[in-house]
């Protein structure tokens, strides 16, 4: 019942949310089955509500904690029109497990089970090769990069720049490591410069992930036009208390966001036209 509690909180706070529960065999087959059913029920419930503010996915932990039996159960119970959320090749152990137990690489196993597709979100993708990238591209599957989580867990650095260059829809996330997207933005910018030993890396790719990739990912699950200030689009706005010494203009906006702004400077938040926080005071909840 945890998904319904989270959905209730999302409704009360007015936050647009796409939810799923992490399926795995770590707590036994019964819990795995319950997890599959809770995801399926929440997906159907969100469709019935049809508010444009709540959506659902079939959540999975990672292939090394999900047996073929549970994969089959999830595939059989997933409602049409939605995809999966799964951690992929976050650690080298995930790859070693898949090769040892299934004789194939992780993305190949997911492909065989029909997991890939335009509504599926793959987290991390650190230990994948060119063939697997081809499969992700061919199936129009989405990827989310979580730089702080990968660094904090000492997992490694994913080939995110190559994913973007290949035209794979790639977004920027947190994996729950932080709730401040400006932190992920800053860390992603320097991580790939360091990893590639190239000071010119990531200047264009990271803004593309945050401001274009994330919007397109969200629009695959929500009906509204998102991420723009224009008539007909969802009124999602933040107001930032930012008064820089250096003038801000259309040519240097990204640098101001990257080097000057933080989440702590957000003073007002509007979601779907509803003011949620005004002058750092929560409006809709106690």
Model-derived features with residue positions:
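Metal-coordinating catalytic core of metallo-dependent amide/deamination hydrolases
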Residues: 3-126
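Alpha-helical segments flanking ligand/cofactor-binding loops in enzyme cores
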Residues: 8, 72, 108, 133-134, ...
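Divalent metal-coordination and catalytic microenvironments
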Residues: 10, 58, 87, 122, ...
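Glycine-enriched alpha-helix->loop->beta-strand junction motifs that scaffold or abut catalytic
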Residues: 14-16, 77-83, 115-118, 135-144, ...
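Short, acidic/turn-prone active-site loops that include or flank metal/cofactor-
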Residues: 22-25, 90, 147-152, 175-177
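Histidine/acidic-residue-rich catalytic or RNA/ligand-binding cores of hydrolases
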Residues: 92-104, 132-137, 154-163, 178-196
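His/Asp/Glu-enriched, well-ordered alpha-helical/loop segment
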Residues: 112-115, 119, 161-244, 258-262
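C-terminal cap of metal-dependent C-N hydrolases
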Residues: 234-283
């Amino acid at each position: 019942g945890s998904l319904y509690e989270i959905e209730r909180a999302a409704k009360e706070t007015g936050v647009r949310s796409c939810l799923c529960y992490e399926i795995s065999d770590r707590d036994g087959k019964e819990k795995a089955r319950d997890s599959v059913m809770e995801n399926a029920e929440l997906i159907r419930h969100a469709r019935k509500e049809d508010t444009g503010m709540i959506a659902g996915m079939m959540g999975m932990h990672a292939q090394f904690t999900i047996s073929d039996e549970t994969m089959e159960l999830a595939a059989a119970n997933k409602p049409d029109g939605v995809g999966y959320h799964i951690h992929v090749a976050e650690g080298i152990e995930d790859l070693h497990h898949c090769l040892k137990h299934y004789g194939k690489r992780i993305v190949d196993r997911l492909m065989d089970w029909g997991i890939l597709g335009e509504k599926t979100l793959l987290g991390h993708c650190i230990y994948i090769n060119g063939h697997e990238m081809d499969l992700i591209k061919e199936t129009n599957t989405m990827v989310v990069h979580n730089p702080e989580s990968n660094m904090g867990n000492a997992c490694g650095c994913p080939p995110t720049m190559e994913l973007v260059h290949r035209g794979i829809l790639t977004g920027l996330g947190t994996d729950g490591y932080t709730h401040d997207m400006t932190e992920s933005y800053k860390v992603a910018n320097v991580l790939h410069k360091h990893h590639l030993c190239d000071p010119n890396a990531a200047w264009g790719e990271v803004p593309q992930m945050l401001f274009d990739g994330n919007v397109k990912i969200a629009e695959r699950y929500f009906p509204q036009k998102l991420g723009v200030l224009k008539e007909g689009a969802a009124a999602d706005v933040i107001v930032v208390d930012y008064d820089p010494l250096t003038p801000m203009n259309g040519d240097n906006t990204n640098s101001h966001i990257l080097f000057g702004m933080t989440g702590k400077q957000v003073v007002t938040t509007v979601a779907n036209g509803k003011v949620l926080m005004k002058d750092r005071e929560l409006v809709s909840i106690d």
